[in-house]
Amino acid sequence: MNPEQQASRIVAGIKKAGIDFVATLPDEKMVDVIRKVENEPGFRHIPLCREEEGIGICAGAYLAGRKTALIMQNAGFLNSCNALTTTCLQFQIPTLLLIYYAGDIGDRGFTTLGSVTEPAIQALGIRYYILRRTDEIDETICGAQVLAEDSKKPVAVLLTKSVLGVK
């Protein structure tokens, strides 16, 4: 499938999970997903300047009764660790983190970034899942959202190039 078709499947999975509020930071590999989110009438979409501001925005939306997701690259996740710790983890705010896994297998440009992503997620005590197969999109996104709601914590889904349909 091409990136636009893959983006449609990912956004359908987000909708199926019951999420209605999505904050995003532009990223080259996630551009098709973000465009689909922007055009989805069932979402309140908030474009961001920095990823960590999305943590506070999603926390506020959750406290107002919304189900939230934050879309970013793993470099942005690393920038957001303090905000995640002092907001979502401390105050038990579930947010679905959809993170492009730069530096994963076959991604030559970001090997160092890829090597620290999972250890950083683990250090925060955030559960995470690596999404590599298109046929697991709905199950993984919906399951991660259920886990976030039940645990009252953020849950991360790492999106690989193969799932995004990008090179």
Positions of PLM-derived features:
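Thiamine diphosphate
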Residues: M1-K167
